[in-house]
Regions:
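Extracytoplasmic beta-strand/coil segments of soluble accessory domains associated
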Residues: 87-128, 150
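Transmembrane beta-barrel wall of Gram-negative outer-membrane proteins
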Residues: 184, 191-222, 227-264, 298-301, ...
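Gram-negative outer-membrane beta-barrel transporters
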Residues: 438, 543-545, 565-660, 742-744
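Conserved C-terminal beta-signal and adjacent last beta-strands/turns
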Residues: 255-257, 433, 492, 588, ...
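Short acidic/polar hinge/loop motifs at secondary-structure boundaries
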Residues: 128-156, 175-177, 272
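N-terminal periplasmic "start-of-domain" segments of outer-membrane beta-barrel proteins
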Residues: 52-83, 109
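Face-selective signature of the C-terminal outer-membrane beta-barrel domain
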Residues: 301-458, 481-493, 530-531, 535-541, ...
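Membrane-embedded beta-barrel scaffold of Gram-negative outer-membrane proteins
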Residues: 313, 319-325, 483, 489-495, ...
Length: 745
């Protein structure tokens, strides 16, 4: 269980859930000391490369596989690390929309083809990173995740089979840092707007004479944030110990992340933001007729991943891979609430009035993962088969840690709810690539997935949320790839994906007395690619046809997660265009554009004009929520002199809607952002160099707002009697900057 320290009527999460400076210094000392070992030149680099590739071979695909992909190597990831959060590192990739509450330094979100993050499968070396219950990746729980990556591949559509909830629009496959040939080190310091400070320190030994390699990265980020009363303190640690044998690789890896961040998801009304664009209502309460703000309105979380990988080359054709992971997480939201006693089950004290309460909603969970895979690479046939097993257990519980009512005696902390979740998830798959000849090959990927999910206990609003379900899904994918010439190819793939509801979807459905259904997707992709020394072009047509798709209804819970609803029939149909041109060594231009049609079919909802007392039922083909029909990005890169680089980066996101009704009152205006980046590198001899960077975001100082939540409500006030539309916004920052100095050795 989470340990607590009690102080002055409040309690704090045990300080062990932070990465201490002593721990950081110890890691640095170990990293420095291991440089004293002699390096090895005995390991054949081809063997090292093959062993590293075995770890990710079942989640990565080559350009012979008929899937729609974008891959970023280490150099490209370093280039994108001027963005603090991984979603913003990826925002120039096709069909990607990144958003955040504080300019990308706090809570951030990622959507691909309009699909939200809980439907994007994210994995690290083939082990799923998505939380098994929420199916989300909370990026700020592990800051600088991109700095831990050797490469990253985005698979759009249903993607290749892997563990965890399958891709329902995209998958992100991350490969962690590989061992290097020689020792290395890097110190990265940055400072930017809103007193933002970021820092990271990395080092590695290279492969030593005994086959061992040690690598680590420590990162931190603090910021006051753009929005008032926000602030964040984030830390992460990546450590890896690898042993390379003649045909075997054993790797121990740990990733630790912690964060404390102010809550901003409540959003604010137009008139509030017009008066103060940084206004944040979270934590507001009234005392003696004055409005005050609770200073510790925070989201706090600590996450630890411990992983073991064993890869072995049985022969020139056969390889085996085993991976094991243990993940532990614990954390809490602390909030000031103004509610009645009955909201916390304290009906014996109910007096009809609202009172100030400080509450904590806590989470404590563990996940255990085992992946086993075998692969055969023949002259004409590539075959792989494997099994992914995951077990998850978690607890959700909430306590009142302080309240203001001298007439009532209540021992604090007072726990008012607790519930549990257990989930078994097993995936078995077989994949094959067969070459009919030098130009034509076929791809098949068959996945069988079984889930047993049980939730029991009482929810935060006190209803019994007992739920047990078994799901059995068959997810096949079939495709053809045709090589037109040495630099051209075309492909077609059809795939089916099925997935279970999230815990929050189940909880909300139980509370409403509804039935929540699993989702199904039929994905069709037809693509063309051309690449030459100076330019490249690709076009991809896609049709994603859904049954019972879960989409945001525009509202959010008290804990900040999006509330969802089943849409019986819906589709996302579009074309993705991507091109790059380098007419000279000193200039390159890259761009991508997605044009799409994202609709719910025969969607039924109720509508009204503000002040109406009667609702009208409407059935129509409406836009899916948060799914813009136009998304584009462009990068112009200039190299005016050797070791200097200037980039202009543009991002356009078209009009979208906050819910699934397509009503103009809930529309989000389109926006265009222009960022600029300049860098220069000084070479100091050997591998020593210093790079200075300056990034200016939103150069045009465009003022825009993104959605926090929307909802219809009924007012029984005599002067405002009737139905009304309601919405809140998250103001996005104007022009801001980040400067960095990087020393590599």
């Amino acid at each position: 269980m989470v340990k607590h320290i009690y102080s002055c009527g409040r309690y704090l999460l045990h300080q062990a859930t932070r990465i201490s400076r002593r721990q950081m210094i110890a890691c640095l000392a170990v990293a420095i000391s291991i440089f004293n070992f002699q390096l090895s030149t005995l390991k054949a680099q081809d063997t090292v490369r093959k062993l590293d590739e075995v770890i990710i071979q079942d989640v990565r695909v080559s350009n012979k596989t008929p899937l729609t992909t974008s891959t970023m190597n280490r150099e490209q990831l370093d280039e994108a690390r001027t963005a603090v959060s991984l979603p913003f590192m990826l925002e120039t990739q096709p069909s990607v929309v990144a958003s955040g509450e504080n300019g990308g330094v706090g809570a951030t979100a990622l959507r691909i083809r309009g699909v939200d993050g809980s439907r994007i499968n994210v994995n690290i070396n083939g082990i799923t990173l998505n939380d098994p219950e929420s199916q989300e990746v909370f990026w700020y729980n592990i800051p600088n995740l991109g700095g831990m990556a050797q490469s990253m591949q985005i698979q759009r559509g249903v993607g290749a089979s892997n563990g965890g909830s399958p891709a329902f629009g995209a998958a992100i496959n991350m490969q962690t840092l590989n061992a290097q040939n020689h020792p290395y080190g890097e110190a990265d310091l940055g400072f930017g707007s809103w007193n933002t400070r970021q820092y990271s320190f990395s080092a590695g030994t290279g492969i030593l004479k005994n086959g061992l390699s040690f690598d680590f990265t420590y990162s931190g980020l603090t910021s006051d944030g753009y929005i008032r009363s926000w602030g964040t303190d984030q830390q992460s640690f990546f450590g890896s110990v690898s042993w390379y044998g003649e045909r075997t690789l054993i790797k121990l890896l740990t990733i630790i992340g912690s964060q404390t961040t102010g809550i901003t998801w409540d959003g604010a009304y137009d008139y509030e933001l017009d008066a103060d664009p940084t206004y944040n209502p979270s934590g507001a309460y009234t005392m003696d007729g004055k409005t005050l703000y609770y200073p510790n309105e925070t989201d706090n979380y600590w996450q630890r991943h411990y992983q073991l990988y064993v890869s072995h080359l049985l022969s020139d054709n056969w390889s085996l891979n085993a991976a094991f992971d243990f993940t532990h997480g614990d954390g809490y939201y602390e909030q000031m609430k103004n509610k009645k006693y009955k909201a916390y089950g304290l009906t014996q004290y109910e007096d009809g009035s609202k009172h100030n309460f400080v509450t904590r909603k806590e989470l404590y969970n563990n996940a255990y993962t085992a992946n086993l895979a075998a692969r055969y690479n023949g002259e004409n046939l590539g075959l792989s088969f494997g099994d992914n097993f995951l077990y998850y257990d978690g607890e959700h519980f909430g306590s009142i840690i302080w309240f203001r009512d001298t007439a009532v005696h209540l021992d604090t902390p007072y726990e008012w709810y607790r519930n549990y979740g257990d989930k078994y998830d097993n995936t078995t798959y077989v994949k094959a690539n067969y070459d009919f000849n030098d130009n034509l090959n076929a791809y098949a990927d068959l996945q069988l997935r079984f889930i047993n999910y049980k939730v029991y206990g009482y929810a935060d609003d006190l209803f019994d949320m007992h739920f047990t379900a078994n799901y059995l899904f068959f997810n096949p994918k079939l495709g053809l790839n045709y090589r037109i010439s040495d630099n051209q190819r075309t492909y077609f793939v059809a795939g089916i994906s099925n997935r279970e509801p999230r815990r929050s979807d189940i909880k909300d459905a139980i509370g409403r007395g509804d039935t929540i259904l699993p989702e199904s997707l039929l994905d069709l992709e037809l693509g063309y690619q051309f690449a030459s020394a100076r330019w490249n072009f690709s076009a991809n047509l896609y049709a994603m046809l859904y049954r019972n798709q879960m989409t945001p209804n525009g509202d959010v819970s008290s804990s900040g997660y999006a509330l969802m609803e089943n849409v019986e029939k819906s589709h996302r149909i579009g074309i993705e265009l991507q091109a790059g041109y380098q007419p000279a060594d000193w200039f390159r231009f890259d761009a991508n554009l997605t044009l799409s049609h994202n609709k719910s079919v025969d969607f039924t909802y109720t509508d009204f004009a503000d002040g109406d007392t009667v609702l009208q039922t409407v059935t129509a083909n409406t836009d899916l929520s948060l799914s813009p029909s136009i998304v584009g990005a462009a990068i112009a890169t200039f190299i005016p002199v050797k070791d200097a680089k200037i980039q202009l980066i543009g991002k356009y996101v078209g009009k979208q809607y906050a819910d699934n009704t397509g009503r103009e009152c809930y529309a989000i205006d389109p926006y265009f952002l222009l960022n600029a980046k300049a860098s220069y590198t000084w070479h100091l001899g050997g591998t020593n160099e210093i790079e200075a960077q300056l990034v200016v975001n939103n150069v045009l100082d465009h003022q825009y707002r993104l959605n926090a939540w929307v909802g219809d409500y009924f007012s029984d006030d005599a002067s405002w009697y009737g139905y009304y539309h309601d919405r809140a916004w998250l103001q996005q920052p104007g022009i801001n900057f980040m400067g960095r100095v990087i020393y590599r050795f």
